[in-house]
Amino acid sequence: MTRLDNTRVIRPATGTELTAKSWLTEAPLRMLMNNLHPDVAERPEELVVYGGIGRAARDWESYDKIVETLRRLEDDETLLVQSGKPVGVFKTHPDAPRVLIANSNLVPRWATWEHFNELDRKGLAMYGQMTAGSWIYIGAQGIVQGTYETFVEMGRQHHGGDLAGKWLLTAGLGGMGGAQPLAAVMAGASCLAIECQPSRIEMRLRTGYLDKATERLDEALAWIAEANAAKAPVSVGLLGNAAELLPAMFAAGVRPDLLTDQTSAHDPINGYLPAGWTLDQWATAKEREPETVNRAARASMAVHVQAMLDFQAAGVPTVDYGNNIRQMALEEGVKNAFDFPGFVPAYIRPLFCRGIGPFRWAALSGDPEDIAKTDAKVKELIPDNPHLHHWLDMAAEKIKFQGLPARICWVGLGDRHRLGLAFNAMVASGELKAPVVIGRDHLDSGSVASPNRETEAMMDGSDAVSDWPLLNALLNTASGATWVSLHHGGGVGMGFSQHAGMVIVADGTEAAAKRLARVLWNDPASGVMRHADAGYEIAKACAREHGLDLPGIL
């Protein structure tokens, strides 16, 4: 089993020349490769895309076999991928998914990091995170609009809707957290983001998600103060450890206007540098003494969360951004770790009730002009949403594409299928140079059960019921998505979540149009169904408005 290969540089094909037998197999092939593009993945030489050890394939041997199989796969065959390893090709039919993926799934009693890590060391499993192992990660843009929407709502609730002259304190500039600085600036606030790995800061500077960086706290705070005085937001990366810096900042009287965290706290061994440790110490200990790292990281998280609680008690609006750090601190004895809320119940759930979530698409042509044309089409089809238009304008101006050109755009039931059909027509007419793939994050309305994140504090107490993502995956399979994935542990770590993903290809054919109409209606509708079942009136009203047939609910 080979997981490190420094000789590999993976980039997807672009243009209209196929390297597989059809666009339905070319698309997953290009998106798998895109996940490992050097401008996209965090550690592509190790197959790590983002989120600690979130991989695109189990090992390089498995990667090569997936590529080889996709290139020979017929349009009436389906490839099965088990935790990043291709295990079977079966005859199905043209409207069935071309790939079905299951990553990191464990029987609940054994769903722990300890058991998973043992399987991982033996080469029997792979951590797929959410979009790493499901081949639809598009770089930090994939989370930036959701982060922007969250920060805007925080500003509305806590600062009268105006974040000018305000600043956000956070930590973590990895594949998800790296979106925070740009999202904050887009929302009108400055951002001070602490990060312990220089390579991550450098990547965010290179891709335009971060304006400045320093190793000195005093310099970082001076830049923030200057920007706030001018009401000209700036994003600053500060090299350091959050578990050391947050308590020191609180003791020194520093008070941000907003506070959150996106360190990779979900994975104590691979994702969180213990306070007082160097990166070299950490790298060595992860291999030789993983339990020592685990204990030290968890102890540091307790200090980190206590500092966040101290800031909250001092009046700073504080929110958990879904990395399970509160749970880790609770287990370390911080009894009131959950005193600050998660971002979904605090800010996002009303959107989920209407099936609104992180809809995304990528241009297989590799031409940014295709994304510009689809942006214009979104504005044309949804003309009365100035907030959405503002987002698209900002994205076009500020977001640098990583790998294949792509766009994230939060839309919901009633709009997703219209956009998909319009994109398909643009491919058919030649307006777009090549097909597009349409997918989403697993963090969506009906595709995840995660009691410490997406389904935290459901009004009926159904936080941990994971039937819903299973039904979502089954429904998308039956509806004709091009590939469907079912994962465990994404975002919050082993034992704390189950979630499903789907991707569908718009290749300009009539057959694709029929699949798009089904999938892009049913997928968000299942989210409305889930929230209506939980008792949310917004979801029930949405279901009635769109004529959903929910016999046991309405």
From Swiss-Prot:
Keywords: Cytoplasm, Histidine metabolism, Lyase, NAD. Its main location: cytoplasm. The lineage of its organism: Bacteria, Pseudomonadati, Pseudomonadota, Alphaproteobacteria, Caulobacterales. The gene is hutU. Catalyzes the conversion of urocanate to 4-imidazolone-5-propionate. Belongs to the urocanase family. It comes from the Bacteria. It catalyses: 4-imidazolone-5-propanoate = trans-urocanate + H2O. The keyword Disulfide bond does not apply. HAMAP family: HutU (MF_00577). The active site is at C409. Its EC number is 4.2.1.49. It is found in: Cytoplasm. NAD(+) binds at residues 51-52, 129, 175-177, 195, 200, 241-242, 262-266, 272-273, 321, 491. Its cofactor is NAD(+). PANTHER family: UROCANATE HYDRATASE. One of its GO terms (molecular function) is urocanate hydratase activity. Pathway: Amino-acid degradation; L-histidine degradation into L-glutamate; N-formimidoyl-L-glutamate from L-histidine: step 2/3. GO terms for biological process: L-histidine catabolic process to glutamate and formamide; L-histidine catabolic process to glutamate and formate. NCBIfam families: hutU, PRK05414.1. This is Urocanate hydratase. SUPFAM superfamilies: Urocanase. Binds 1 NAD(+) per subunit. One of its GO terms (cellular component) is cytoplasm.
